[in-house]
Curated annotation (Swiss-Prot):
It comes from Candida glabrata (strain ATCC 2001 / BCRC 20586 / JCM 3761 / NBRC 0622 / NRRL Y-65 / CBS 138). InterPro entries: Spg4 (IPR020485). It comes from the Eukaryota. Belongs to the SPG4 family. Stationary phase-essential protein not required for growth on nonfermentable carbon sources. This is Stationary phase protein 4.
Amino acid sequence: MPSFWDSFAVYNRNKHAKGDVHGGHMSQNMGGQPMYLQAKEHADIKKKEDGTLEAKIETPDGPRLVDVSNMTQQEFERTYNSLRKGEPNNRVNF
């Protein structure tokens, strides 16, 4: 039975819940599985869609691969702009 004066002791081993302590140092992860703390707004990482940027250009026949070394400047710009369709405009004006 604890004494009334135990609550006023500077260091009372019985005051706190007993932990899983091995050795003389304190650690939050002694002998157990790793503990992961995540914020409430944490969202799991979503898997990226399979395929490359070239495969994103779709024709009625399906995705096609594009060889940029054989393209003209206008074809490249048209392809580049079609890949970026729907992206936000991140330009900053100083």
